[in-house]
Structure formats: structure tokens, C-alpha cells
Amino acid sequence: MKKQVRSYILYLFLGFGGINSCTIREDDPVIPSSQIVVEGYLFAHKPVSIRLTESSPFGVDSAVWVPDLQISLESSTGKKMVLTYSGKGEYMSKPTEKIEGAGTRYTLTLTYKGKEVKAITTIPEKPKQLKASSSKMIIPQEIIQGENENVIGIGSSTGGSKGPSLSLSWLNPESNYYSVKIVNTSVNPEPIRVLPPGFLLDNLVGQIPPNQRNWMTLYSDQFYTYGRHALILLRLNTDYVALFDTENSTSLNLKTPPSLISNGLGVFTGVNSDTLYVDILKK
């Protein structure tokens, strides 16, 4: 079965560490170093979840979780959070401890292999005047017959120009970066495209690459199931967007390893959002 890949999780292309010896022969083994990788998205008014892994230059599949570190998260208003380890590299705040609003700056600090790892980010403004051209979209169900190697992952994050569509708009006078995430909130939703036995869609949560527009058109092939969908407009910081090739953005095409985290790699960034709902109905 095709490996499932979650949208916008950063798989980092890692380089080799420094070499201490003064003279190197061709037959000397060179052992690359590992580094800590931070994955932290601070959503305004939400609890905190930060994931830590230890990278390996031998490939992303060999990265391992980093457990039981002491992590401090402090806001510019003076509030401090101590995150606790919950397993699989994830550190969480208490459910009652939430990120503050726009303009609040956060500093993350931890110690890894004797070095202080530090990162700073600011929560951006919430999107304003988010509107949709319709609260519903009617899509005919499609029965896909036979074998087709293109069945897996049907639909796309960028959308096509055929079939029903709806438009989103918002204020963006300063050309800030936005992305839209599409999430079905229904329980056991019915598929729009019925696939042959043994085939599975590899991604039921869609996300549009970051852009600086004040509008977006969503097409029927960007929805995989019927039911109520949350259309989440994300306001993104430029430090996150800069990690990607914006002309062909995916979770796998970082041009260079991130360098905004002192003594570490990864992403630590503030996010703000607004949400609309749309019902996807069968024709």
C-alpha cells in the first residue's frame, strides 16, 4: 500500500556535520552528525504541540523521536509554559494553556546534547473578512472501474478547472501569505470517487500551497468525500513560507535546510486562522 504522507510535514534534506581531524585520507570513514529537528506550529488561541526528532544524514526514514527533554515556551507578555512529553516525540501544553493572540512573541528554549536550542516567532494577525461564494457544492459521484495507476491520490492540492467550484475571498492589502486547508468534519463520510477494491486515497485532508492573493477558487476535484467541510484560511509568517519553493510547493522540496532555529533544524512559527463551512452534496 502506498505510503501515506501528511501535507506540509517537513522532511529535511540533511547535510554532513563538521570534521575535527586535520588530515583526512580517502579511506578514512566520515561519520556525519545528527541534529535535532523542531516541528512547532503555534496556532492562536489553541493548546501547544511541538514535535522533536533527531535527524540522521542517512535518510529521513531513520529519524528517531527525542523523548524526555525539558522544554520552555515563554511569551512576550511574561507567561511561561512547561511542555510535557506525551510520546512519539510530541510535547504538549496543558489543555487550559493556550497560545495568545496576534502580535504575541514566543521564545522556545531547550537543551540538546549540551547545547541550547532556541527559536523565536510571532503570532500573525487573524484573517479578515473571509467570505465564500456559496455554502454548498453539488458534485456527482464517480465510479472508477478497472486498474488505473493514477487512482491513488486522485484530485490535487492545486485544483483543476473542470466541474463545480466555489470562490473564497479575504482582505490582504499588504500581500501577506495565506493557505487554505480543507478538512471533512463528518463521521464516516461517503466517497465522491468510488475506487476499485484494493485502492485507497492517500490524502483526505487537502491544503493549498501558500500564496499572496486575496482570493482562491476551489474545484470539485479538491474534495474527496461528501459532507460538511471546514475551509480553514491560514495566515502564515514569511519565515515558514521561505522554506519552500513557492513555484512548486510540496512537503518534500525544501531548497535548503532551515536555519532559523539556533543549534537545530526544522520549523517554529506562529499561525492564525479563520474558518468557513461548506456542505458537499451528492447530485
Spell out what each predicted region is.
Residues 22-283:
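A sequence/structural signal for flexible, mid-protein segments enriched
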Residues 1-33:
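Bacterial Sec-dependent N-terminal signal peptides
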